Amino acid sequence: YQRXSRYYYYXGPPDDIDDRY
């Protein structure tokens, strides 16, 4: 998890593929 992805912060399902990892 890099650059503060949603999954990293919210711990929820990755909504943005570009922001997933």
Curated annotation (Swiss-Prot):
Cited function: May be specifically involved in the formation of the nacreous layer.
Lineage: Eukaryota, Metazoa, Spiralia, Lophotrochozoa, Mollusca
UniProt feature, compositional bias: Low complexity: 1-14
UniProt entry tagged with the keyword Metal-binding: no
Oligomeric form and interacting partners: Homooligomer; disulfide-linked. May also be disulfide-linked to insoluble organic matrix.
Processing after translation: According to PubMed:11250534, amino acids 4 and 11 may be sulfated or phosphorylated. By similarity with the N14 matrix protein, amino-acid 4 may be a cysteine involved in a disulfide bond.
Keyword Disulfide bond: yes
Family statement drawn from the similarity comment of this UniProt entry: Belongs to the N16 matrix protein family.
Keywords, ordered alphabetically: Disulfide bond, Extracellular matrix, Pharmaceutical, Secreted
Tissue specificity statement from the Swiss-Prot or TrEMBL entry: Component of conchiolin, the organic matrix of nacre. Is dispersed in calcium carbonate and also linked by disulfide bonds to the organic core of nacre.
Region (Disordered) location: 1-21
Subcellular location: Secreted, Extracellular space, Extracellular matrix
Protein name: Conchiolin protein p20
Cellular-component GO terms for this entry: extracellular region
